[in-house]
Amino acid sequence: MRRINERLDEILPKITDASFRENKGLGNEIGFYIFDYDPKYEMLVREHIVYMQERLKNDSSLHIREFDLYEVMLEILEEKGYLQKNIDMEQKKGSDFILNATRKALRLTSNNDLVVQYITDRVQPNDIVFLTGVGKVFPIIRSHTILNNLHKAVDNVPLVMFFPGTYDGLELVLFGEIKDDNYYRAFQLIDK
């Protein structure tokens, strides 16, 4: 298994390659990628994302558009006036109630999923979408759910999910312990 620094150093050359930005896989599959990593490297991965954004900020041909799913969720709840209500309601009715209420408020399993809409409204043609905050937003937003819903909506630009856990081309295992539903449409961004 290769070291995390070696894998991180391969991301920038990969995402700036023209074939990556054409956004098609082997059989013209949509360009969804997962960069999985040991959760203990979370801060290192976050720092490297900032580094890549800095390196590309003067390149007009492409732009990294990062969506921290946790921050997106908070912003949507705040805009809808639900954030403080959720905090108050959690104290009265408990975490399980709020978990379900928040999922419903975000419409996570419907055709008008608010997180997906938030992302699609902001994606531009020269973007490479980075999804972060996967661990922070669990269990409210599940990895496979957001990927499945985005698959229908973001098909014109490459998307990379930074995943604190393991992905073997079929199973997403958050934190190396929590098995999510299977997801088989994404490619491994950088081999381990």
Curated annotation (Swiss-Prot):
Coiled coil: none annotated. Induction: Part of the brxA-brxB-brxC-pglX operon. One of its GO terms (biological process) is defense response to virus. Keywords: Antiviral defense. The keyword Ion transport does not apply. It holds the Pfam family BrxB. BREX systems (bacteriophage exclusion) provide immunity against bacteriophage. Part of a type 1 BREX system. This system allows phage adsorption but prevents phage DNA replication, without degradation of the phage DNA. Methylation of bacterial DNA by PglX probably guides self/non-self discrimination. When the brxA-brxB-brxC-pglX and pglZ-brxL operons are transformed into a susceptible B.subtilis strain (BEST7003) they confer resistance to bacteriophages SPbeta, SP16, Zeta, phi3T and SP02 and partial protection to phages SP01 and SP82G (these include lytic and temperate phage). Belongs to the BrxB family. This is BREX protein BrxB. It comes from Bacillus cereus (strain H3081.97). The gene is brxB.
